[in-house]
Amino acid sequence: MWIGVISLFPEMFRAITDYGVTGRAVKNGLLSVQCWSPRDFTYDRHRTVDDRPYGGGPGMLMMVQPLREAIHAAKAAAGEGAKVIYLSPQGRKLDQQGVCELATNQKMILVCGRYEGVDERVIKTEIDEEWSIGDYVLSGGELPAMTLIDSVSRFIPGVLGHQASAEEDSFVDGLLDCPHYTRPEVLEGMEVPPVLLSGNHAEIRRWRLKQSLGRTWLRRPELLESLALTDEQMVLLAEFQREHKP
C-alpha cells in the first residue's frame, strides 16, 4: 500500500514510519509513506502557508497555492487511482467498517489541515472524500491521518504476525473484544478464568464470544442494535445478562 501525506509537519509521521507494526511494514516493503509539505511549494522568503479568510473572523486558513501544488505533486507521484482524503471534523466518522473500506485502496493521499481549515474550493476540486476520527477538535489533521494509516495497515497481508489478529480485533464483527489474559496465572488474587486453561477450544471460543457480547452490552449497547445476532449469540448474551444482573 502506498500513502502520500500532505502536512506542514511531515516529521510527525516518523511515528508511523519508524516504530511499531507500521514501522515494520515500511521496513519490509509492505507499506510506503511519502510526505509533502506545502511549505516546500512557497515562493516568498518567509515561506508563508497561511492566509486571511474572506469575511473576517478569528484565525487563518491554509494558503491555497502551496496546498494545491503539494497535492498535485503527490498525485503525480501516485499515478492513476489514488484516492485523495481530507481529514476533517465535517467528514464521515471513521469506524471499523470504514477502515475495511479504505483498506481496499492501494493508493491514498491524506491531506492534513491546519489553522482554521482549508478553502472550500480546494475541497471541491482536489478532495475525493472527507473523514473524521470523532466529534472533537484537534490542532491539525496529522493525528487523524496517523490513526487512519495505522488502522488500515493492519489489513495489509503480512503486516501482522498473525492475520487472525486483525480479523478478531474489536469492532470487526460489530462487537467489542473479549478480555485477554497472560501469565502469571494468579495476579493479586485474581485468577485466569479456568476455561482458558482447559485446552477445550470449543469451550474457549464459546466463552470468548459470550464475553465479547456481554462487554458490548455493558459498555456500548448501541452497537448491538445494528446487529442481527445469530441464535447462538442470543443464547450467550442472555446467559451473560442473567449472570450479571444488578
Curated annotation (Swiss-Prot):
<dbReference type="InterPro" id="IPR023148">
    <property type="entry name" value="tRNA_m1G_MeTrfase_C_sf"/>
</dbReference>
<dbReference type="GO" id="GO:0002939">
    <property type="term" value="P:tRNA N1-guanine methylation"/>
</dbReference>
<keyword id="KW-0819">tRNA processing</keyword>
<feature type="binding site">
    <location>
        <position position="113"/>
    </location>
    <ligand>
        <name>S-adenosyl-L-methionine</name>
    </ligand>
</feature>
<comment type="function">
    <text>Specifically methylates guanosine-37 in various tRNAs.</text>
</comment>
<dbReference type="GO" id="GO:0052906">
    <property type="term" value="F:tRNA (guanine(37)-N1)-methyltransferase activity"/>
</dbReference>
<comment type="subunit">
    <text>Homodimer.</text>
</comment>
<keyword id="KW-0489">Methyltransferase</keyword>
<keyword id="KW-0808">Transferase</keyword>
<dbReference type="InterPro" id="IPR002649">
    <property type="entry name" value="tRNA_m1G_MeTrfase_TrmD"/>
</dbReference>
<keyword id="KW-0963">Cytoplasm</keyword>
<comment type="similarity">
    <text>Belongs to the RNA methyltransferase TrmD family.</text>
</comment>
<dbReference type="GO" id="GO:0005829">
    <property type="term" value="C:cytosol"/>
</dbReference>
<dbReference type="InterPro" id="IPR029026">
    <property type="entry name" value="tRNA_m1G_MTases_N"/>
</dbReference>
<dbReference type="Pfam" id="PF01746">
    <property type="entry name" value="tRNA_m1G_MT"/>
</dbReference>
<feature type="binding site">
    <location>
        <begin position="133"/>
        <end position="138"/>
    </location>
    <ligand>
        <name>S-adenosyl-L-methionine</name>
    </ligand>
</feature>
<keyword id="KW-0949">S-adenosyl-L-methionine</keyword>
<protein>
    <recommendedName>
        <fullName>tRNA (guanine-N(1)-)-methyltransferase</fullName>
        <ecNumber>2.1.1.228</ecNumber>
    </recommendedName>
</protein>
<dbReference type="InterPro" id="IPR016009">
    <property type="entry name" value="tRNA_MeTrfase_TRMD/TRM10"/>
</dbReference>
<dbReference type="InterPro" id="IPR029028">
    <property type="entry name" value="Alpha/beta_knot_MTases"/>
</dbReference>
